[in-house]
Amino acid sequence: MKLNVTIEIPKNSNIKYEYDRATKEIMVDRILHGSMVYPHNYGFLKEALDYDGDELDVLVFADQAFQPGIKVPARVLGAMKMIDGGETDTKLLAVIDVDPRYKHINNFKDIPLHWLAEVQDFFENYKNLQNKKVKILGFEDEIWAQKEYEECVLLMKEYGHLKKDEFVTKMMKERPEKYIK
C-alpha cells in the first residue's frame, strides 16, 4: 500500500511536534525529557483517525531526516500495536518509496529485525522520565496494517469533526476494547 505521509518529526530529533487538526498547523508539543531521539521519521495520515483521537501515525524508514510538514511517498509494510495512556495508538511502519536503496523492502518480512527492535525500544522507553508507561502489543504485517488504515479512514470520515476528547469519550463507550487501563 502506497501512501503520502505528512512528516511531523524528523529522524534523530528530540522535539515532539503535534499536528492540530483544527488549526491545520504543526506545533511543538514538548521536548523529550531524556536523551532519546526519534529513530526514524515520524508522520501521520490526515485522512485517517486513530482511537487516541489523533491522525494515524506512520514511521517512515529512510536515510534522510525530513522536515515537519513535508509529504513523503511511502510504502506501508506493517504496524506496531501500542497502548499509550490506555488508548490504542497504532504506528504504521513504512519505507520511503522514492529511494532506490529501499526498493528491495516490499513487505513486513523484509524489515530488518534491528529496525523493529529500535522502534520497540524507543516507544517503550521514551516517556520513562515523565513516569508514563507505554505498552507494545506486538507487530503486524502489511495486510493487518491495510485493514487498520481502512478502519481509521472510516473513523475520520464519520468522526473527524469531533474534538479529540469528545471522540475518545464516544469511542470508549462504543469500542471499549481499544482502551486498556
From Swiss-Prot:
Keywords for this protein: Cytoplasm, Hydrolase, Magnesium, Metal-binding
Transmembrane segments: none
UniProt-listed GO biological process terms: phosphate-containing compound metabolic process
A GO molecular function held by the record: magnesium ion binding
Residues reported in the UniProt entry to bind Mg(2+) 2: 57
Catalytic activity line of the entry: diphosphate + H2O = 2 phosphate + H(+)
EC numbers on record: 3.6.1.1
Cofactors: Mg(2+)
Gene Ontology cellular-component annotations: cytoplasm
InterPro entries: Pyrophosphatase (IPR008162), Pyrophosphatase_sf (IPR036649)
UniProt binding sites for substrate: 16, 30, 42, 126
Major location category of this protein: cytoplasm
Description of how the protein assembles with itself and partners: Homohexamer.
Function field: Catalyzes the hydrolysis of inorganic pyrophosphate (PPi) forming two phosphate ions.
Name listed for the protein in its UniProt record: Inorganic pyrophosphatase
